[in-house]
């Protein structure tokens, strides 16, 4: 039966297990294996300068554009653990390599969870044993997607069917969402026959306009990793544009799922900025609004408080005419020429989706959209209790 995630494309199998890393006792380790005949790989990692040990190892191993497997654990980030953390990440890869008969450099590794605690290597080793046991690997994409969850409330999968080839994906991440990815792990698989250069181009283009425009709370994780693995098992060689479109579609779907499942979310908010000189300025302005706590609180309260939008965007590094800014909530003008529009306070924001559009009045062609959420009581409750 066709799967909806990473095992939908030909040439991929997966497994999942409960190793006891999560205090909840829920599944917490997963394995994705590319059975070939090709082993093309590309990745995008966090831009946080404090990077977790698995990111260091994966960055080295994917540099040649080839990977045959990726190991995941949830419940422990293996970040900020010094040389011991690095050694544990490498030990995990070495142990898996022995079990699968692969070279260690053919394996990627990802961790997510609490920062600053050493990996329980006895549990990791036992988990690898279970992941590679006879009969464990198969069409288990859904189980793998569930095993990588942390504060997610639902697993996240998608599939894109192209002309004779497929892209599948799984992801996790609902908090610490900000540019340069998020607390986010994503694995995309495809049975298309592509080169490493094609994979890198498609992944960079897709993440730039999907995951990197998702900004939930302004925090950037130490562990962000997005992998694209290609088996070539379909025998189809798409063009670069065809690959770009399919990878974008998969990433966009996952990004929307992450926004919908964001920690404590009650409102899904899009912030679009126009009327400035460059796209870079527009995205800076949109992010400045999206990160502003007063704005986010107004969204939680369904309050069409356009003044908070102006106060926030005025801090952005973007060209603007401060006397001629326009703000629209759900396509209704609430502020024109930087003053309130008639009926602004009566705009209905009670729905779950809110579209905010801001014209900075500088007359340029720059534009960008950032997706965010409101700031609710539940968000504070979830994150104040996270380490416990």
From Swiss-Prot:
Top-rank EC class of the record's enzyme: transferase
Site (Involved in the stabilization of negative charge on the oxyanion by the formation of the oxyanion hole): 112-113
Entry's Gene Ontology BP terms: L-arginine biosynthetic process; ornithine biosynthetic process
Disulfide partners: none
Residue(s) at site: Cleavage: 182-183
EC number per UniProt: 2.3.1.35, 2.3.1.1
Binding site for substrate: 150, 172, 183, 263, 383, 388
Listed InterPro entries: Arg_biosynth_ArgJ, ArgJ-like_dom_sf, ArgJ_beta_C
Molecular function via GO: glutamate N-acetyltransferase activity; L-glutamate N-acetyltransferase activity
Annotated active site: 183 (nucleophile)
Reaction(s) catalysed (UniProt annotation): N(2)-acetyl-L-ornithine + L-glutamate = N-acetyl-L-glutamate + L-ornithine; L-glutamate + acetyl-CoA = N-acetyl-L-glutamate + CoA + H(+)
Coiled coil: none
Pathway this chain belongs to: Amino-acid biosynthesis; L-arginine biosynthesis; L-ornithine and N-acetyl-L-glutamate from L-glutamate and N(2)-acetyl-L-ornithine (cyclic): step 1/1; Amino-acid biosynthesis; L-arginine biosynthesis; N(2)-acetyl-L-ornithine from L-glutamate: step 1/4
UniProt keyword terms in alphabetical order: Acyltransferase, Amino-acid biosynthesis, Arginine biosynthesis, Autocatalytic cleavage, Cytoplasm, Multifunctional enzyme, Transferase
GO cellular component: cytoplasm
Family: Belongs to the ArgJ family.
Description of how the protein assembles with itself and partners: Heterotetramer of two alpha and two beta chains.
Function: Catalyzes two activities which are involved in the cyclic version of arginine biosynthesis: the synthesis of N-acetylglutamate from glutamate and acetyl-CoA as the acetyl donor, and of ornithine by transacetylation between N(2)-acetylornithine and glutamate.
Protein name: Arginine biosynthesis bifunctional protein ArgJ
Native species: Corynebacterium efficiens (strain DSM 44549 / YS-314 / AJ 12310 / JCM 11189 / NBRC 100395)
Gene transcribed to yield this protein: argJ
């Amino acid at each position: 039966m066709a799967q909806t995630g990473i095992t939908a494309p030909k040439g991929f199998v997966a497994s999942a297990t409960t190793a006891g890393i999560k205090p909840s006792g829920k599944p917490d380790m997963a394995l994705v294996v590319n059975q070939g005949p090709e082993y093309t790989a590309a990745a995008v990692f966090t831009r946080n300068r404090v990077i977790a040990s698995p990111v260091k190892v994966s960055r080295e191993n994917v540099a040649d554009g080839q990977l045959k497997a990726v190991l995941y654990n949830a419940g422990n980030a293996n970040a900020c653990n010094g040389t011991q953390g690095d050694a544990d990440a490498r030990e995990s890869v070495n142990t898996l390599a022995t079990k699968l008969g692969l070279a260690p450099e053919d394996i990627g590794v990802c961790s997510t969870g609490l920062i600053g605690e050493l990996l329980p290597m006895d549990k990791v080793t036992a988990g690898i044993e279970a992941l590679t046991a006879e009969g464990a690997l198969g069409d288990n994409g859904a189980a793998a997607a569930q095993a990588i969850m942390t504060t997610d409330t639902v697993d996240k999968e998608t599939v894109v069917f192209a002309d004779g080839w497929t892209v599948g994906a799984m992801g996790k991440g609902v908090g610490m969402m900000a540019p340069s990815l998020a607390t986010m792990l994503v694995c995309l698989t495809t049975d298309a026959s592509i080169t490493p250069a094609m994979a890198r181009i498609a992944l960079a283009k897709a993440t730039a306009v999907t995951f990197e425009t998702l900004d939930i709370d302004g925090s950037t994780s130490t562990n962000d990793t997005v992998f694209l693995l290609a088996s070539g098992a379909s025998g189809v060689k798409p063009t670069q544009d065809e690959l770009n479109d399919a990878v974008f579609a998969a990433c966009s779907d996952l990004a929307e799922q992450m926004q919908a499942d964001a920690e404590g979310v009650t409102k899904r908010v899009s912030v679009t900025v126009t009327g400035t000189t460059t796209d870079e300025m527009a995205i800076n302005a949109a992010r400045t609004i999206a990160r502003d706590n007063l704005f986010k609180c107004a969204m939680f309260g369904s309050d069409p408080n356009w003044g908070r939008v102006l106060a926030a965007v005025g801090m952005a590094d973007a060209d603007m005419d401060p006397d001629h800014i326009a703000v629209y909530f759900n396509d209704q003008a609430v502020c024109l020429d930087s003053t309130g529009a008639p009926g602004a306070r009566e705009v209905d924001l009670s729905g779950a989706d809110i579209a905010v559009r801001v014209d900075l009045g500088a007359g340029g062609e720059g534009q960008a959209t950032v997706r965010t959420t409101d700031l609710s009581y539940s968000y504070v409750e979830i994150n104040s209790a996270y380490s416990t």
